[in-house]
Every structure is written in C-alpha cells, then in structure tokens.
Amino acid sequence: MTVPKKRTSMSKKRIRKNIWKRKGYWAALKALSLAKSISTGHSKSFFVQQTSNKAAE
C-alpha cells in the first residue's frame, strides 16, 4: 500500500479545497440557470412535455 512521504502543507490543502468548492459552485450555478430557463419556457436545449389543464376539467 502506498503512503505519502511528507505531510501536505496547509496552503496546498487550502488551494485544493477551494478548487473542489469552486467546482461545486459552478455546477450549482448551471443547474439553477437551467431550472430558470425551463420554468420560464426559454430553454433551447431541454425539452419538457407540456401538460394541458383542459383534460382535468
């Protein structure tokens, strides 16, 4: 089993953690943007099946 030879410095650990957090931030931002475009009906890349309310009445 491989073991790291030296301890990772605090600054390197902080940099890696911030990169990991930034990836999550951008993923959440894209998901929110897609949800907004779907809810307003302006989505060009996502197709949603429209349901009619007349059948229920």
From Swiss-Prot:
Q: Which InterPro entries match?
A: Ribosomal_bL32, Ribosomal_bL32_plant/cyanobact
Does Chloroplast appear among the keywords? yes
Query: Please, which domain of life does this record's source organism belong to?
Result: Eukaryota
What organism does this protein naturally occur in? Drimys granadensis
Name where it mostly resides: plastid
Q: Where in the cell is it found?
A: Plastid, Chloroplast
- Which UniProt keywords are listed? Chloroplast, Plastid, Ribonucleoprotein, Ribosomal protein
Q: Which GO terms describe its molecular function?
A: structural constituent of ribosome
Similarity comment text for this entry:
Belongs to the bacterial ribosomal protein bL32 family.
- Record protein name field: Large ribosomal subunit protein bL32c
In its UniProt record, which GO terms are filed under biological process? Answer: translation
Q: What are its GO cellular component terms? A: chloroplast; large ribosomal subunit
Does the record carry Ribonucleoprotein as a key word?
Answer: yes
